[in-house]
């Protein structure tokens, strides 16, 4: 079970809210959120309510100022990443609705272009495990968290101008 403490102001100041599960709208508990401390587990935090917008993966540690991380407006929602110790399986597709080239993944891939000659990934099906997909090769750029499920259109998820290029399994002891 994870535990994260959110603070209204930078450097762990102001009112706080302790969380150990998903939270779709932080404004229910805090008027703003500009720092946090992850005491256990791993979380994905979002800068828009309902798990939308830019995402940041957070493991155990202190995050005193979101501005330094590139988050412009603070945290608005969060998901706890559950512990997982089984096999990892994901199927990626070149086009929306599981169209075009398809590849099965069971491990990290630092470049879809280098490994598969696939220049874009527009949909995926996560069978097992929890994954982070990155906008750029070599695990750089914006991320999107994927848990088991079918993702027919990244555009419909709000990522119309994002071209995903690499993916990594979340294997931390979350």
Swiss-Prot record:
Protein's UniProt keywords contain Cell division: no
GO molecular function: structural constituent of eye lens
Keyword presence, Repeat: yes
PROSITE patterns in the cross-refs: CRYSTALLIN_BETA_GAMMA (PS50915)
Stretch list, region Connecting peptide: 83-87
Xref: SUPFAM superfamilies: gamma-Crystallin-like
GO biological process per UniProt: lens development in camera-type eye; visual perception
Location of the Beta/gamma crystallin 'Greek key' domain: 2-40, 41-82, 88-128, 129-171
Domain of life of the organism encoding this protein: Eukaryota
Keywords in alphabetical order: Eye lens protein, Repeat
InterPro entries: Beta/Gamma-Crystallin (IPR050252), Beta/gamma_crystallin (IPR001064), G_crystallin-like (IPR011024)
Family, as annotated: Belongs to the beta/gamma-crystallin family.
Cited PANTHER family: BETA/GAMMA CRYSTALLIN (PTHR11818), CRYSTALLIN, GAMMA M1-RELATED (PTHR11818:SF139)
Domains: entry comment: Has a two-domain beta-structure, folded into four very similar Greek key motifs.
Quaternary structure (record): Monomer.
Function comment: Crystallins are the dominant structural components of the vertebrate eye lens.
Name used for this protein in its record: Gamma-crystallin M3
């Amino acid at each position: 079970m994870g535990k994260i403490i959110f603070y209204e102001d930078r450097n762990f100041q102001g009112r706080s809210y302790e969380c150990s599960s998903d939270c779709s709208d932080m404004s229910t508990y805090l008027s703003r959120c500009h720092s946090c401390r992850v005491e256990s587990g791993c979380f994905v935090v979002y800068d828009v309510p309902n798990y939308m917008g830019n995402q940041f993966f957070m493991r155990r540690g202190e995050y005193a100022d979101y501005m330094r991380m590139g988050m412009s407006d603070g945290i608005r929602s969060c998901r706890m990443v559950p512990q997982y110790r089984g096999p990892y399986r994901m199927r990626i597709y070149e086009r929306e609705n599981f169209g075009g080239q398809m590849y099965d993944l069971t491990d990290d891939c630092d470049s879809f272009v280098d490994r598969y000659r696939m220049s874009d990934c527009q949909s995926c099906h996560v069978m097992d495990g929890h994954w982070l997909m990155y906008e750029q090769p070599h695990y750089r750029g914006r991320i999107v968290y994927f848990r088991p499920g079918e993702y027919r259109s990244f555009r419909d998820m709000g990522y119309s101008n994002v071209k995903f290029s690499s993916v990594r399994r979340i294997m931390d002891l979350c």
